Amino acid sequence: MNSKFWLGVWEIVKFGLIVLVIVMPIRLYIAQPFIVSGDSMVPTFHSGDYLIIDELTYNFVREPEIGEVIVFRYPEDPSKFFIKRIEGLPGETIDIGGKEWNLGEDEYFVMGDNRLFSLDSRSWGPLPRKNITGRALVRLWPPTALAYIPQ
């Protein structure tokens, strides 16, 4: 009985190690979950939508592009993550209602799809590239809205 017990414990430990070796790199470097909070991206996303964020593309393949939905660390409080759409690229000048923003070489202009109720670059200015975590890739929840997110 004692050897069966330890054999069972060893199987659990092996399973845990395999999970760590496979899941942790994926979670840290390739993709991560994100739950939408608030209404700034309505009608595209609603509060409570569960997304998978692609962290690989912007780190190894290419830079963000106009129209892509990204998740990033809020510049005024990096412990918070926001989701917005890229509306301006590095080096561009953005003019909205007579107010102008000149973007630096590593700055992006982001806005929520719900323009009237979004805290975004219009409020706090350009988003530094270093704050971008990744792009929205897949919506998993709610099940009725399960979809790949076109860019």
Predicted regions and their residues:
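Structural motif
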Residues: D49, E65-V69, E92, E107, ...
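Acidic loop->beta-strand submotif enriched in PP2C/PPM serine/threonine phosphatases
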Residues: I94-E105
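Short, conserved beta-turn/loop elements at beta-strand boundaries and strand-helix junctions
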Residues: P90-I96, W141
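Protein maturation boundaries and topogenic segments
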Residues: M1-F81, W101, K130-N131, R135-Q151
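Active-site loop architecture of trypsin-fold serine endopeptidases
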Residues: S118-S123
